[in-house]
């Protein structure tokens, strides 16, 4: 794993030692090269799962998430260039340092084998994200958003720390492999139920589960572009990853405890999709759509069948790329119109025809059109839910319908209609932006040719 961690750490001196006009080129090139390293981890067979080291190892669940994390850093750097064009060089370097340190802690979180180390790194990701949101956001409300983000996550995570210490006292080890192999059966007593809640609550806040999701729209709306991208694409997946790691340790109690949470996520999925239909703020709409997509993942993980785990992993990767792409598109609109209100940016199709193509493709991937991996993930989860209970098909089917509606609503309000007066002197789309959109879309479409590499343990 060091062959991935050390080059990423070396991005820090590269950033600070580069000349001012070379910062973007150097960091983008270096981070693109780093993003090819996780591809080496793909050819592991299931037999030598933990073959790396005692501290860091990768397996079929963490490798796709590592690929997503490393692929996202060059894209974030490319997306931030216009946003930081008026900042002094030291401020640009500090911003990049925050992104890189976030990347390092994410890589180490996805590969940690000790649960306490996983917990510490899980919390470490808060600090750079908080700095990015509260320092580089656009509106004064960003401080409020930062407080929400910090307190929701910390209050959710404290019970997890206590539960981990309790487990360590009783079992003497917190190695994930050992715990999975030697886990005691948890009976459904009050104390065990509370421990189950303590274990899962941190991840449910992070996912976020409906009801614990209020920090997400605030944080997304106020964050700068790179903050929104990494928050939607990778930080939400930390919750799913943690749940998939820890749920097998908590059996058979999960079978009893999962019902209210599955119901809540199915209900929340429809509620947040419906909320999307009456949003006027573009970034807020994309944030709520993230909540509804991740609700499916929560339900899938709690069912605990191989198919639902496959669907959850695929859906996490697909959603990471799609929502990041949507935030990039929203940001390109924001940089031109200086407003997030959708109606004010209507009729952009006539002014930026190529951007309209990216908008169309992004909307279609968001509503899970074949042959994208979004469809594969949703179908796997749908079938797993259906075999768990037939009635769920009504809720998931309704959710698919509403998702289609709000995706097309988002597309038509921003692209169709008559252009408003303040969009007359608009800049054309830059090559950098088109490349950025293409680099988001190409993995979504290409992975549909060989989806087994992001399907997790089932393959």
Swiss-Prot record:
Keywords: Electron transport, Membrane, Mitochondrion, Mitochondrion inner membrane, NAD, Respiratory chain, Translocase, Transmembrane, Transmembrane helix, Transport, Ubiquinone. GO terms for biological process: electron transport coupled proton transport; mitochondrial electron transport, NADH to ubiquinone; mitochondrial respiratory chain complex I assembly. Pfam families: Oxidored_q5_N, Proton_antipo_M. InterPro entries: NADH4_N, NADH_Q_OxRdtase_chainM/4, NADH_UbQ_OxRdtase, ND/Mrp_TM. It is a multi-pass membrane protein. The chain crosses the membrane at residues 20-42, 60-80, 94-110, 113-133, 145-165, 196-216, 224-244, 257-277, 284-303, 308-330, 341-361, 391-411, 437-457. It comes from Pongo abelii. Belongs to the complex I subunit 4 family. It is found in: Mitochondrion inner membrane. Core subunit of respiratory chain NADH dehydrogenase (Complex I) which is composed of 45 different subunits. The keyword Iron-sulfur does not apply. The gene is MT-ND4. Its main location: mitochondrion. Core subunit of the mitochondrial membrane respiratory chain NADH dehydrogenase (Complex I) which catalyzes electron transfer from NADH through the respiratory chain, using ubiquinone as an electron acceptor. Essential for the catalytic activity and assembly of complex I. Its EC number is 7.1.1.2. NCBIfam families: NDH_I_M (TIGR01972). It catalyses: a ubiquinone + NADH + 5 H(+)(in) = a ubiquinol + NAD(+) + 4 H(+)(out). This is NADH-ubiquinone oxidoreductase chain 4. GO terms for cellular component: mitochondrial inner membrane; respiratory chain complex I. GO terms for molecular function: NADH dehydrogenase (ubiquinone) activity; ubiquinone binding.
């Amino acid at each position: 794993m060091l062959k991935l961690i050390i080059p990423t750490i070396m991005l820090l001196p590269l950033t600070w030692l580069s000349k001012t006009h070379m910062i973007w080129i150097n960091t983008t090139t270096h981070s693109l090269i780093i993003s090819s390293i996780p591809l080496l981890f793909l050819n592991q067979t299931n037999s030598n799962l933990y073959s790396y080291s005692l501290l860091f190892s990768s397996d079929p669940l963490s490798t796709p998430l590592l690929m997503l994390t490393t692929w996202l850093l060059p894209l974030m750097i490319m997306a931030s260039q216009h946003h930081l064009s008026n900042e002094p060089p030291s401020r640009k370097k500090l911003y990049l340092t925050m992104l890189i340190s976030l990347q390092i802690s994410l890589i180490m979180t996805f590969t940690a084998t000790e649960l306490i180390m996983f917990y510490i790194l899980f919390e470490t990701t808060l600090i750079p994200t908080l700095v990015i949101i509260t320092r580089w956001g656009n509106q004064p409300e960003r401080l409020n958003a930062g407080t929400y983000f910090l307190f929701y996550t910390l209050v959710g995570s404290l019970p997890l720390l206590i539960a981990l210490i309790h487990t360590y006292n009783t079992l003497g080890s917190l190695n994930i492999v050992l715990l999975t192999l030697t886990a005691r059966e948890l009976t459904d007593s009050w104390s065990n139920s509370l421990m189950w809640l303590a274990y899962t609550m941190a991840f449910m806040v992070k996912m976020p589960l409906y009801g614990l999701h209020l920090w997400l729209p605030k944080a997304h709306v106020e964050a700068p572009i790179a903050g929104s991208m990494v928050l939607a694409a990778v930080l939400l997946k930390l919750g799913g990853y943690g749940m998939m790691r820890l749920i097998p340790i908590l059996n058979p109690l999960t079978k009893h405890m999962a019902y209210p949470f599955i119901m809540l996520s199915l209900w929340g999925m429809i509620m947040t999709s419906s909320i999307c239909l009456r949003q006027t703020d573009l970034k807020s709409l994309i944030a709520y759509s993230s909540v509804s997509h991740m609700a499916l993942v929560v339900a899938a993980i709690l069912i605990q069948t191989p198919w639902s785990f496959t669907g959850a992993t695929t859906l996490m990767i697909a959603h990471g790329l799609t929502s990041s792409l949507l935030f990039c598109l929203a940001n390109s609109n924001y940089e031109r119109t200086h407003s997030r209100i959708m109606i004010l940016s209507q009729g952009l199709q006539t002014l930026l025809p190529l951007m309209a193509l990216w908008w169309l493709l992004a909307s279609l991937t968001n509503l899970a059109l074949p042959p994208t991996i979004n469809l594969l993930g949703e179908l796997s989860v749908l079938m797993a839910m259906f075999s768990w209970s037939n009635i769920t098909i009504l809720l998931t089917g309704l959710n698919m319908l509403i998702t289609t509606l709000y995706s097309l609503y988002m597309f038509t309000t921003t692209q169709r209609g008559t252009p408003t007066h303040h969009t007359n002197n608009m800049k054309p789309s830059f090559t950098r932006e088109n490349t950025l959109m293409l680099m988001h879309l190409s993995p979504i479409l290409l992975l549909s040719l060989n989806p087994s590499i992001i399907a997790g343990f089932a393959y």
